[in-house]
Amino acid sequence: MDLADAAQATADEPARSAGWRLNDGQRASLRAIARRLPENGLIIADEVGMGKTRIAVAVARAVIDCGGRVAILVPPGLGYQWRSELRDGKVQSPLLLRSLWQYLCAWQNDDPALREPWFDERAVLISHAFANWSLGGNRQAWRWRLLPALCARWREPRRGSQSSRRGDRELEYLRRAVAGIVEAASIDADAPMAQRLTTLVGDMMPADGRRMGLNDAAAYRSGGTLRPALERAVGAGLGAFDLVIIDEAHKSRGDDSGLSRLLDNVVLASPSARRMALTATPVELDSGQWEQTLARIGADTKAVGNVIERYSQAVRRVRQCIGNDDARDAYKAAASAFRDALARWVLRRDKRNDRYVQAFARMAGEPGHAYRREREIVVDTGQLDDGWKQAVCAAESLSFVGRQADADWSSKATRLRLTMGNGHGIATLMDQATHDAEADRKQEEHDQTAAAEPVRADPPSDTDDKARQRAQFWIDVATRPFGGGQGPLYDHPAILAAVNAIEAVTRRGEKVLVFGRFTRPLRALVDLLNAREMLTCLDAGKPWPQSKLHDREWPAVQAAHRQLKRAGPLERSELEHALEQNYRTLESEREKYRGDLLSLIEQGWAGDTSNPWAKNLFDAFGRAADMQRVGSADANPRALVARAMHALRGGDLERRDPLAYAAAFVELVEATSDRDVEQVDMDAAGDADFDDVDFDAAWKTIEDRLNEEFNRPEGGFARLMHGDTKPETRRMQQLAFNRAHVYPRVLVAQSMVGREGLNLHRACRTVVLLHPEWNPAVVEQQIGRVDRLGSLWESLIEAGRHVEQPQDVPRIEFCPVVFKGTYDEVNWRVLHERWEDLRAQLHGVVVSSNLADRHPELASWIEEINDAAPNFTPPPESTAEPSGVMQRTAQNDDQFGARDPGQERRG
């Protein structure tokens, strides 16, 4: 079977029982890939949320069905999503390879027949960060000894190797790995594994007798002389791959990045291997990044650069001269050349061909791309009180005087100016805003003089002193609004504007996703949202899942009381009493879920053998519950699980449907289990090997995580996800956020954490951007968290086909908070310019339709320009087929090539 036939077979399969099926656009992409991949590598640049991963799984399966092997390089946080998609697509894969120790553990079994070497796996998931090893110095020798051991054994294979000392398992695993790799490579001296080992030995142990100092630990450090050779040695143990899939291929573009080292040194390619890069943003900040992305798949970029640059120049000119015939003709010629130059390597489906976007265009009478609407949350400096107006003006003044002061003052002044609009700079100056300015200034001047005296040769000049005094004056003015010291960020105009916009969305029953960069303002936003919602619920007699008020929350509650204009003074003791009474009512409601909890879950399992991992954990849960039959939610596993299920499922459990109870328990298990012991893959007989799994210990870990998650002090209306948020907590937050009627209603995510790898689209279509970004690709990724297949927006379009007014057609909304009169207004303007360039190259939107609304006389020219934009969409299928949405019941009869059943599982 060749690749085209295998891909066709995968595309034509009926829906699997779990609903895994390619839609029409994905099937067209798969056929186009099957035609082009034998000739060269490919970039799959589908827009965010259109199912690139599923296409890649289908391609991987087709390659495996043809007898090939596949390496899949993914960001560290996406292993779970990839494993899930591979499992649904019936592609067997070990756990995500993250470390050298995990690499060696493939040879941990004492019985050689039960070992699972990486080179025997048909598909291997590898973390982008796999090659970021900490080596050299005092690090353990086993971390780098693979290279000298492999070279010695390959040079003299008959010599063998001695067993390691008893109990030295690292070196024993290393010895087994070396023996296994050499044995496998020896089967075919012309194969890639043998060729790489021969080259390594030739480089490290040349015939003239020289040695490369293979036992010098320092040479294996990052940048060390032997580091690349060790990377190639490790790659030999992974075996040769016929297809290398690179997820998020726009990441780590530098030559020295971990991903680049994986591609250049670690991953061993077969002679006919191809690379397939997945990225929604092959170009981010400038058109030259096309060349970097193309280089990732081994494309020849020499002739492409000029074509890309000419297209970028033509786009800029035609935007400035829309009515100029020559500019339009030059643009159309450049667009055609751009498309022709990249078409052999690039496939991209965008929302122009999405049926929901097309339905929106018909309903709204607008271009399809208008389904996304930008709605600025404006902070108008002119409407602020005098203190804030002075603060904004003072921050801008710092741009003039800060550069005249010394480096320390200049840095402080610049930071305040650049971050005034989003609250970050204000947070860093809180201490200065809450003490006696005059007394503290004297102390600070004394400290500076004392610190400078030993090293300063010349006294400060009058100019330096005056510049510093001017900078200090403006800093004092900028921080004056916070002199009260009661949680200054809670009254920051940008945060208040965001709160009002967020609450307007939650009041209509939808959720809001917020992105920002700086932790302090994000935490202040979460605290304020929770405090306001808590007071609102108490006033309305609605349940609030919190029994005590903690000291850290009190400033936010005071601010919320003032902002909501609640009657009378705020007494903490009265508030805590109201919380306790409210919580008792909520606990009484939870009680009804606890009594029959175990029996209802067990009834839900009846006859279902599809998830033995979760079933074994349920049995462990039952044993733990029997040991602790009494107690509060803090101590009783039954009460804890009931609380968690109630929080995640809410009214779904009121029907007391055993299937709903069992499904809710499985969700808890999948979200809180360690991914290193996640649902174990089944072998051919349908049985899982759990002999070495301590399910009681595994359940205790889950119980601890549930305790941490559901016994938090805060109520949870809004939650914060930042860099230190644990993976299992992120999964729980994702699970709950995708449920329409449970907390959190607002998820506030730090940009670096939440913009990739999370699906947050099932109950949310609104994204608030609290802090400005410079990179439009980042904003695309952020909006893409809610703009995905199966989103709330799609369901609203489906339900609202007969909407009366075009302006009422549902849209996905992204809402930047723009503080007018501060530097972030400039930031947003620059971002918009870059975003327009990105859309011209990837989205087919060279000139915004908003311009046509303002200038109808330009409408036909704008349509002409946008219609000529490069389009890399694969051609549609020639025959109509039933919608993938309707086919959900067909059984899967996938077949793999013959394998030893013992090699089909690692988990």
Could you tell me what each predicted segment is?
Residues 271, 763-764:
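Short, structured coil segments at secondary-structure junctions
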Residues 775-803:
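Conserved SF2 helicase motif VI
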Residues 770-773:
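Short beta->alpha connector loops at strand-helix junctions that form conserved
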Residues 767:
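Substrate-binding groove of N-acetylhexosamine-processing glycoside hydrolases
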